[in-house]
Amino acid sequence: MLLALDAGNSNITIGAFEGSDLVCQWRLRTVHDQTADEWGILLRNLFSPAGLDIRRVDGIIISSVVPPIDSTLAFMTQRYFHTNAMFVGPHTDIGLEIRYDNPNEVGADRLVNGVAGFYKYGGPCVVVDMGTTINFDCISAAGEYLGGSIAVGIGISINALFSKTARLPKVDFRRPKNVIGTNTVASIQSGLYYGAIGMIDGILERVISQLGPETKAIATGGQAHMIVEGSRYLKTYDEHLTLQGLQMIWERNHPEAPQSE
């Protein structure tokens, strides 16, 4: 069994794979000062309720954009899973040629999304990952990671609006019934929702004009399913894209690993 961890700024998403099949998924908060023992006990306690045997974990792959917790996660995997985790980085064999000016600057999650987008949907493609930031990752038809855009995330926008104004309430992100809000909450939700869509569609329009009209646009991440409902360019929502990309990279680097039928 493969354990795949995507450590982001706000959450850590964890997936258990049997071959290429995702059999269970969990989401935990990213806690910078959590110890290896706390992480290990927390992860081990997830398995039994899911009906999984932790002793069957024989591989762990991690993509992380949170350097302060990398060494803690590495030690945790050694102590509690008796294996050395594979960390995805710019020198990992991911099956894409990285065309970024400085490959060391590319977040591991962006590379992983590029792999999953290209090998699941073909190129050219652009993956839009909506997390703490909104990342646009572009892959050519030849399988080259070209780069993309990084924009402010929806959660950051909500927090900034709430913290920098005296009378505006903090609201949940949701699709409003109408673009014209008839109360303060509805007006804020309209601005957040259609503002995000306008930004995303504006960037995608320019990306598609550069990569070509055959470009596939794939959405993943927290609020992506709501954005797809209103976007002109995003028609595909893939909830597990990042975890599947991690599994693909593991499989590429461990061809001897058993595959699902």
UniProtKB/Swiss-Prot annotation:
Name used for this protein in its record: Type III pantothenate kinase
Gene Ontology CC: cytoplasm
InterPro entries: ATPase_NBD (IPR043129), Type_III_PanK (IPR004619)
Active-site positions on this chain: 109 (proton acceptor)
Subcellular location: Cytoplasm
Assembly: Homodimer.
Binding site for K(+): 129
Required co-factors: NH4(+); K(+)
CDD domains reported for this sequence: ASKHA_NBD_PanK-III
Predominant cellular place of this UniProt entry's protein: cytoplasm
Reaction catalysis annotation: (R)-pantothenate + ATP = (R)-4'-phosphopantothenate + ADP + H(+)
Pathway membership: Cofactor biosynthesis; coenzyme A biosynthesis; CoA from (R)-pantothenate: step 1/5
Function: Catalyzes the phosphorylation of pantothenate (Pan), the first step in CoA biosynthesis.
Keyword terms, alphabetized: ATP-binding, Coenzyme A biosynthesis, Cytoplasm, Kinase, Metal-binding, Nucleotide-binding, Potassium, Transferase
A GO MF label: metal ion binding
Annotated ATP binding sites: 6-13, 132
Alphabetized SUPFAM superfamilies for the sequence: Actin-like ATPase domain
Family: Belongs to the type III pantothenate kinase family.
A Pfam family it matches: Pan_kinase
Residues reported in the UniProt entry to bind substrate: 100, 107-110, 184
Record GO biological process: coenzyme A biosynthetic process
